[in-house]
A protein has these predicted regions:
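Short, flexible hinge/linker loops that cap or flank conserved catalytic cores
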Residues: 404, 489, 534, 546, ...
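Hydrophobic/aromatic beta-strand patches that form the interior of the parallel beta-sheet core
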Residues: 218, 232, 392, 570, ...
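Active-site-proximal cap/loop segments of hydrolase catalytic domains
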Residues: 600-770
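Cap/lid segment of the alpha/beta-hydrolase catalytic domain
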Residues: 146, 150-164, 177-181, 513-517, ...
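C-terminal substrate/ligand-recognition segments
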Residues: 328-329, 402-417, 542-550, 602, ...
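Beta-propeller folds
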Residues: 1-494, 502-506, 510-511, 585, ...
């Protein structure tokens, strides 16, 4: 791969693919694609070219072998490989996972509960020692291995667990595995008493669930485009050929899922597109019956429903069965309605019942930006709860993201000011509020603070919050992610929630809504010389070219304050209303310890600031995503926080599309780009409805097949259509007529490291290969 006369890496030559013109014509626009022939995955020529690209990559990276080894050693030195999760109770057992040093996969285990009122999990290790004292010890009394993925993966080049559930009596396990990497799972049923498996296999399916008595399995099948489209019913012990189709979705925009309701009284089918949804239900008391629709679908209306009961809340002491409906029919940031199922009959309509909570209109906190400092309410500030449905009146752009109702408490997940939040209340109070026709009285869970000894919850040291060189005046310094987690049991008396930040390892807490008592159950252990107080995190706001202000998260190591010559690693996503929330990463420490500034622009297209933030970065507004990222990069560099010659950007999947776009639109801002399974041939893929996922993606990107405006708009930013000339003098498809930005002669195109998978069904290998 090298020419020894020119010496080493400098002489590496990339493999040059042959060109075979393939013409496509849509909306009167003819495009010649010279590399479409690479779509044939079985072609020996394609396989050889992939091998040549991999060899070229290995040759170019050979000089970094020492650094890669060092980074691996640093990562391993921080990781607690032998560990144990905090057990969660489901029916008669405590379930938990063990990881062991040198093993690739976790081992799922369980121990019997000590009695019906046993809600104290077996000891994992004290919170003060970060859960590290007992995790490496032997088995707990009565411990049983439920599923050892290391053993199951033997003999397979690829292995992924696609679901695992245990029957209510604890005897039968339903599990699915993928040994091909194509996200089609083979499900089997195992007797946990004997280890034997039943003869029937549900092969190549998407998901499956038991009924509580384990006599029936409901499962989802996929069509040729990998779309989950059908639900079938299987009687355990019978041939799969006798399985019955109970639901089929004809609309190719919709994906289908099936599962048990939280109270285990209903089997629930949800069919959803990117913008609308529909729920069907069947009582577990009559699993052979027919499903009935809960609320009929409506364009651009999403909803979900939880079935629960206000135990003993009726006038005569009877239970009140309720449906808790989460929807956006009247508010784009969602609301919660509670329907008394004694007085309302299906099919229901959105807006029935008592409106107990609602989001608030979009309007992000106009906090500190790179140009001027306007006072912003710090993230995590408590808000009042007046008696009306807008549960947190001081919030900006509050978006409700989900609700869960348990026997003893109710939890609400929402976000405001660009950060996730959790609120809770007792079930008793929820019933009282509902019967009185008033909003629910949620109490916000406050994130744990950081004090001198970081093992002891306290208050943050505001005096240490000064930004580098005064360039970030008054920036918000409490960045965190908080969410409900580890609450699989309807009967649990207390709720669990998770907490983490860019600088603080993940924590699992248990909270009692009745008393307000908060207990730290476990903190992820980071080995070696690690002190979270040595790392800084800030939220700043950058004004984009259209006047919108973009929240940006910054992380660096104390003593390496950002400066004009600093290296910067900047990452983004901005699609599907997915939020890039703060989270801890051991691997990130190696960057920060070397003085690299870590930056996350929360660009439009994500969900950080509510539904309007998403709408401003999709379909015919998609260019906002790319422009936001570019404007943030430029602002940070212009503010003297990073050097363009030392700036590297990262994005994966839809974030890989972002990487391709910024490389074409503003190559001068980036020295390098890492694109992980990048969606860089977006227009070609979205034009072909026979490809996996295409039709359902029209709700996200628009439909260029039938809409000429969408076609032209997508072509204006699709990275493959707009690629500048390469080193070999060739251009991407359509580059001669639609190139959005010619390479600037004074600034080389960024160096790009791209990765893909030959069996990826979401972003086909051919896109980054082309």
């Amino acid at each position: 791969m090298t020419d020894e006369t020119n010496g080493g890496v400098a002489a590496c030559r990339p493999p040059i693919a042959r060109r075979e013109p393939v013409k496509r014509v849509f909306h009167g626009d003819a495009v010649i694609d010279p590399y479409e022939w690479m779509r044939d995955k079985q072609s020996p020529e394609v396989r050889d070219y992939v091998a040549a690209q991999n060899a070229y990559c290995d040759a170019r990276m050979a000089g970094l072998a020492g650094l890669r080894g060092t980074l691996f050693d640093e990562l391993k030195a921080h990781v607690q490989e032998t560990d144990m999760s905090v057990p969660v109770r489901m029916d008669g057992y405590w379930y938990f996972a063990r990881t062991r040093e040198g093993s690739q996969y976790a081992v799922q285990c369980r121990v019997p509960v000590r009695g019906e009122d046993d809600w104290t999990p077996p000891e994992v290790g004290g919170a003060g020692d970060e859960g590290g004292s007992a995790v490496g010890a032997g088995s707990l009394p009565g411990e049983q291995v439920v599923f050892d993925a290391n053993r199951e993966a033997e003999g397979h080049d690829f292995f992924a667990l696609g679901g695992l559930s245990v029957s209510k009596d604890g005897r039968w396990m339903l599990y699915g595995v993928d040994t091909r990497g194509d996200e089609r799972y083979d499900f089997r049923i195992r007797d946990l008493d004997t280890g034997d498996e039943l003869p029937e296999r549900l092969e190549g399916i998407g998901a499956a669930c038991f009924t509580p008595d384990a006599r029936w399995v409901f499962y989802v099948t996929l069509d040729d485009a990998w779309r989950p489209c059908e639900v079938r019913r299987h009687r355990v012990g019978s041939p799969v050929e006798q399985d019955e189709v109970v639901f089929h979705e004809d609309d190719e925009r919709f994906w289908v899922g099936v599962g048990m309701s939280f109270d285990e009284h209903s089997i629930v089918i949800c069919s959803a597109s990117k913008t609308s949804s529909e729920v069907w239900m069947l009582s577990t008391a009559t699993p052979e019956g027919e499903f009935s629709v809960f609320i009929a679908r409506k364009d651009d209306v999403e909803y979900d429903v939880s079935f629960a009961c206000f135990e003993g809340a009726g006038a005569d002491g009877a239970d009140i069965p309720v449906a808790v409906v989460y929807h956006n029919a009247q508010d784009p940031n969602f609301e919660i309605d509670v329907i008394d199922m004694r007085t309302h009959q299906p099919p229901y309509t959105l807006g029935e019942g008592v409106r107990v909570a609602v989001g608030s209109p979009y309007g992000c906190a106009r906090g500190d930006d790179m140009e001027a400092g306007a006072g912003a309410k710090p993230a995590g500030t408590a808000y009042s709860n007046p008696a009306n449905p807008r549960i947190l009146q001081g919030a900006h752009g509050l978006a409700i993201e989900g609700i869960a109702i348990h026997r003893h408490f109710v939890t609400l997940a929402y976000r405001t000011d660009g950060l996730p939040h959790v609120a809770a209340m007792t079930k008793t109070q929820a019933a009282e509020d509902f019967l009185a026709g008033r909003p629910w009285s949620f109490r916000e869970l406050m994130p744990p603070a950081l004090d001198g000894d970081w093992d002891v919850p306290g208050r943050a040291d505001d005096g240490a919050a000064e930004a580098a060189g005064g360039t970030l005046p008054g920036a918000t310094h409490r960045l965190y992610s908080i969410g409900t987690g580890g609450n699989p049991s309807y009967d649990a008396p207390r709720m669990r929630y998770t907490f983490s930040s860019y600088t603080r390892p993940g924590e699992l807490h248990e909270y009692d809504p009745a008393t307000g008592h908060d207990e730290l159950l476990k903190r992820a252990r980071v080995l070696g010389d690690f002190d979270p107080r040595e790392y800084m995190e800030r939220r700043v706001w950058v004004t984009a070219r259209d006047g919108e202000r973009i929240p940006v998260s910054l992380v660096w190591r104390r003593g390496h304050e950002p400066a004009a010559d600093s290296a910067m690693f900047i990452t983004g996503y901005g699609a599907y209303e997915i939020s890039s929330d703060p989270g801890f990463s051991v691997a990130r420490l190696s960057l920060l310890d070397r003085g690299v500034l870590y930056a996350v622009p929360h660009v439009r297209g994500g969900g950080e600031m509510g539904r309007a933030w998403y709408e401003q970065g999709r379909r015919l507004n998609k260019r906002h995503t790319f422009e936001d990222f570019i404007d943030v990069t430029a602002a940070l560099q212009d503010a003297g926080l990073a050097d363009a010659h030392r700036t590297v950007a990262y994005g994966g999947s839809a974030g890989g599309l972002l990487m391709g776009a910024i490389a074409n639109m503003a190559p001068q801002l980036y020295a390098g780009i890492e694109a992980d399974v990048p969606f860089v041939d977006a227009l070609t893929s979205i034009l072909d409805p026979s490809l996996p996922l295409t039709v359902t993606e029209w709700d996200e990107w628009g439909d260029p097949l039938h809409d000429a405006d969408v076609y032209r708009y997508m072509k204006s930013y699709s990275p493959y259509e707009n690629a500048p000339e390469g080193a070999d003098g060739e251009a991407g498809a359509g580059a001669a007529s639609t190139r959005s930005l010619q390479r600037q002669s004074w600034r080389p195109f960024p160096r790009i490291f791209a990765t893909t998978s030959m069996n990826d069904t979401r972003v086909l290998y051919v896109e980054p290969l082309k």
